[in-house]
């Protein structure tokens, strides 16, 4: 999108938001002034999105309380137990509550499989991870849930892999205490960005990415072109085949309709 069009679109959304905010004050019954949202780790993309929404809702006189968690699976559990009003949930996360309502698909989150370059083994299939020191995410995280799903498809036991969260995985991989780390999130997430730019760390390209989509439709094959991260340093040096899932904003079904409309509008601004 070119800059003039982007500016026009942003200004248009701003005008709509102002008009909506004025009308919002007169809705009967009145929308709530306090709302809770389960996000994720405080260094992750879900929490960053929550912080942005928190500031925008505060401008409308609504207090959004953010609940940091291990990630998507824990978020779903909190939502199912009606302990929060809203949650950010990774596509494919199993939910059991019939009283949940998907509000919006926000953006794609790639599964990044990082490997130390010094590991001489060429990894293009998950079965080639056998015998390596691998982190697949902390229990309760979307990374862990997705990794378990993929490992099960390959008839691999995930009990032998390490349950480290994203920050722990990043630090351990950089320190040489891990060979491979699974991480789900956006490229601008601090930990993921650090690994994408780190010397001695490379991305695994999954040659069978399209086949996973046939097994589970919520998995989307993604192509990361050579140089997409950094053209000057040619990161990555070649095209990488990845898998991605959709980040979704989900609510309990009793959330006020006017609040839903406001959340959808703000989501357009912050994604």
PLM region spans:
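Acidic, polar ligand-binding/catalytic clefts
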Residues: 70-121, 126, 186-191
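Pocket-lining segment of extracytoplasmic ligand-binding domains
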Residues: 158-244, 255
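Short amphipathic alpha-helical coupling segments at ligand-binding clamshell hinges
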Residues: 256-266
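A structural signal for short loop-to-beta-strand junctions that line the ligand-binding cleft
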Residues: 98-106, 134, 232-240
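Hydrophobic membrane-insertion alpha-helices, especially the h-region
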Residues: 8-23
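Bilobed "Venus flytrap"/periplasmic-binding protein-like clamshell domains
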Residues: 32-60, 109-175
